Amino acid sequence: MGFSKRSIGIISLAAVVALISGGVFLALYTQEPVPVGTHYSSHAAAHFYGDVDPIGVVPQEQARGAIVSHHLLVADDIARTIKSLRQPYVPVVVIVGPDHFSRKHGGVSVSRYGFETPWGRIDPDTDLVDAIVDARLATQNEYVFEMEHSIASVVPYIRYNFPDTKLVAITLERSIAKERIVALATFLNEELPEGSIVIASVDFSHHLDVTAANFHDAKSVAAIAAFDFASIDSLEIDSPDSIRLLLTYLEKKGAQAITATTTNSAIVQATPYSEDVTSYLFATFAPGVPAQSSAANSLHFGDIMLGRDIETAVTQGVDLFEYIRGPEGNFLRGMDMIVANLEGPITSVTQCA
């Protein structure tokens, strides 16, 4: 079967158009890669997040960082804090929080996925995430983010207040080497676009009564306001490393002036005698200097006698402090000084000469 010159010309033109069209399509596709997956906010329904657009919020237009809770019991406080961060241009928001379920043992995790929220999707800054991974400062680990509420509870407020921003989500396992935290904070300081905001998603005292929670919170707030890095690891908070990362970043930015409020679950729920209190700090940081000094605290006991029945209990492995240390051992955390009146001598000699 033969083809005329006209037919061959038409076929050739069609082939060229097809190739050009395919090339254009390919170029467009490769320029804007679609994230390979999606995570989801803690709840799909908007009402779980309280009043996301509260009135009377004082704007912190120069703020470069913040601390919020991830406990939706205080949803309105989260909303007020994040709304106060609104600025004309916020290219990237970084959220850093604890890996509650230790899904990345001893590690720093980042996500390349977007998050679906009641107000739409928030996409990741994949270039920045890839750069963090390439610098060996973190690993991409989507498994961590499947159920990590320190991130999933906060992203809806980011999407609502900053609809055009990109997200970098980071989780930290407990007790990461300080050098790794400082290296990541330094990287963020150097690579984040101007106008970006870093948010630490952290809760404070856990499983204590109101008096003990207030005691620990006073120490925590004072240490954070003073950028007292030496005290961070002993604070009664669920992610000291997240706070260390935030404060290190803010120190490099010169944004150390804090505006802060505190509350706790006993106040919110009107249960003043609760013995299972969770407390919260809501803070923003703007250009300026830190508080001049941190706080010191001390714990005082009465008489202590370590002989007789007490000695027997100790030798049998009985935990003498089981009922005061709390479920997570938090009551005795972070003390600068412990004072007690010791009755009787302490000696390694078991018999008199």
Q: At which residue positions do the language-model features occur?
A:
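Active-site histidine-anchored catalytic micro-motif
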Residues: 29-271
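Juxtamembrane cytosolic interface motif at the C-terminal end of transmembrane helices
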Residues: 22-30
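A generic secondary-structure signal marking the coil-to-beta-strand transition
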Residues: 59-66, 92, 279, 294-297, ...
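Acidic, metal/ion-coordinating pockets
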Residues: 290-353
